[in-house]
């Protein structure tokens, strides 16, 4: 017995007209790595455009430019940084003195002195002159570091008597 079959294409077309299309986009060739033979997992893992790449490398390029400066300019900047740091330390000492005076004058703080709640509230313990002593210690360490660096610079310089222009004199100095 023959069976009649009819294709009902119109009905299926109407049902699927509002569903999302199944068109698959081709993968970009820029996302393919010939070295590893793989595709990029995330489109956001590395910049695709050259402008984004420049923006990404911006700070490192600036760092490289700064490192290429001549040594006198670098020395001036480090001296300025050290001087600025010392100025800040002296300001901290002055402000710590003022802070300690204010804390002594406040009667409510004096009543709570030694209480753990006050230390938790302020964030530091009320050890007398703790800020001042810490700033003084930091200042002393900075001066020691500066003196050490200056000593190392003087020590590392080649004096004219140590510098031999002739290879014969150099070998003679080594043997003696």
Curated annotation (Swiss-Prot):
A motif (LXXIL motif) lies at residues 171-175. Expressed in the spermatogonia and spermatocytes. The keyword Chloroplast does not apply. Its main location: nucleus. A motif (Nuclear localization signal) lies at residues 63-66. The modification Phosphoserine is found at residues 17, 28, 71. Residues 34-48 have a biased composition (Polar residues). One of its GO terms (cellular component) is nucleoplasm. Residues 20-50 are annotated as: DD1. It is found in: Nucleus; Chromosome, Centromere; Chromosome, Centromere, Kinetochore. Residues 82-112 form a coiled coil. The DD1 domain (also called RepD1 domain) mediates the corepressor function and is essential in the triggering of apoptosis. PANTHER family: CENTROMERE PROTEIN R. This is Centromere protein R.
């Amino acid at each position: 017995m023959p069976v009649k079959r009819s294709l009902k294409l119109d009905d299926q077309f109407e049902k699927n007209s509002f569903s999302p299309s199944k068109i698959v986009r081709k993968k970009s060739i820029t996302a393919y790595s010939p070295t590893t033979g793989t595709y990029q997992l995330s489109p956001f893992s590395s910049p695709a455009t050259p402008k984004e790449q420049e923006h990404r490398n911006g700070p490192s390029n600036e760092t490289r430019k700064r490192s290429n400066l001549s040594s006198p300019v670098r020395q001036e900047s480090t001296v300025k940084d050290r001087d600025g740091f010392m100025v800040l330390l002296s300001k901290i000492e002055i402000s710590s003195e003022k802070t300690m005076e204010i804390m002594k004058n406040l009667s409510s703080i004096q009543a709570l002195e030694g209480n753990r709640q006050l230390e938790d509230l302020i964030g530091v313990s009320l050890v007398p002159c703790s800020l001042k002593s810490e700033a003084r210690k930091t200042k002393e360490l900075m001066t020691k570091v500066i003196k050490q660096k200056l000593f190392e610079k003087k020590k590392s310089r080649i004096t004219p008597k140590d510098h031999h222009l002739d290879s014969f004199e150099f070998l003679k100095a080594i043997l003696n």
